From Swiss-Prot:
Belongs to the NusB family. GO terms for cellular component: cytosol. GO terms for molecular function: RNA binding. One of its GO terms (biological process) is DNA-templated transcription termination. The gene is nusB. This is Transcription antitermination protein NusB. Involved in transcription antitermination. Required for transcription of ribosomal RNA (rRNA) genes. Binds specifically to the boxA antiterminator sequence of the ribosomal RNA (rrn) operons.
């Protein structure tokens, strides 16, 4: 069964919030995940994708941080607001582990999350960093899109 783009978008929305909560609270992932299932209507959410992003990001958080750190223009990780950090980690996870998702979709979804939940203008920061990460991690796909060979 094909999952709708809206269900996948809601999964990203909840995953970002859960990652933020995990980072801020230090609670176990399974506890946070259970709370999301209890406190939210998950009937229109791609629950498998939510689970994958939440646990996938947590499993390789340090590796994901290293993916985008070179593009932070002098900022340290602890200088980035926690919402932006969750968005960047989630997007980098999708870049690296979900190559079935076009890089432009990953960036667009991340920018939308930053607009909705992030600090003022954080979406511009997210867009700039992810454009550079995409060129490094998905170079062939980005270049094909830019030259019209997609």
């Amino acid at each position: 069964m094909k999952v709708s783009a809206a269900a996948r978008g809601r999964a990203r929305h909840f995953a970002m919030q859960a990652l933020y909560q995990w980072e801020m609270s230090g609670n176990a992932l399974h506890v946070i995940e259970a709370e999301f299932h209890t406190d939210n209507d998950m009937s229109k959410v791609d629950v498998e994708y939510f689970h994958e992003i939440l646990h996938g990001v947590a499993a390789i958080k340090s590796t994901l941080d290293e993916t985008f750190k070179p593009f932070l223009t002098g900022l340290r990780l602890d200088e980035i607001d926690p919402v932006s950090l969750a968005v960047l980690r989630q997007a980098c996870y999708e870049f690296e582990k979900r190559v079935d998702v076009p890089y432009k979709v990953v960036i667009n979804e991340a920018v939308n999350l930053a607009k909705k939940f992030g600090a003022a203008d954080s979406h511009k920061f997210i867009n700039g960093v992810l454009d550079k990460v995409a060129l490094r991690v998905r170079k062939d796909e980005v270049e094909a899109m830019r030259t019209g060979r997609s």
